[in-house]
Amino acid sequence: MERNVLITADSTCDLPAELKKKYNISTYPLHIILGRTSYDDGVNITPDEIYKHFKASGTLPKTSAVNVQEYIDGFLPLVEQGYEIVHINLGSALSASYKNCCIAAEQLGNVYPVDSCNLSSASGLLALEAAEMAEKGMSGKEIAENIRALTSKTYGSFVVDRLDYLRAGGRCSTIAMLGANLLSLKPSIIVNNKDGSMT
């Protein structure tokens, strides 16, 4: 039986709604914890609300991965309808989401998790490429293999405008933050596309 392929991704791929709709990519939200309340990324909280929380409280949000049952609950109806699923995960060095997705995939079959070794737009680009492969009629297994090969060619980097977030998260000292601000330095964070760690 020939199976149609759907592309899904973790919410951290940061694809705009128009692209998700155009390529029929659904996302699975990671959890953002502010104080004692847990929110679903991109569902019931926006980046602006997270920034407002930080400004008001001075504390960074915590995050948690999509859990195994959430993946199963999302994938099972699709697998039962005859779809293969290629899921683009947030880099495994950054989150347990990939590990959890692999456990769900083992239980369900016809689900192909891909460790993007990246985040944000870099993993979003992989999801878009996977969607184009699906449109060409490639199988889920073929798409997953091709996307895994592309992870080493996909680079993510970010220029940090404000160091107060890095200081609050323990990534730089107060002195380093003040010195960078005084000299108007804007550090760049580069994602290692071999394991998803950041430097």
How would you describe each model-predicted region?
Residues 3-6, 12-20, 26, 31, ...:
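Mixed-charge interfacial surface used for oligomerization/domain docking
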Residues 57-59, 65-91, 100, 144, ...:
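Glycine-rich phosphate- or other oxyanion-binding loops that anchor nucleotides, phosphorylated ligands
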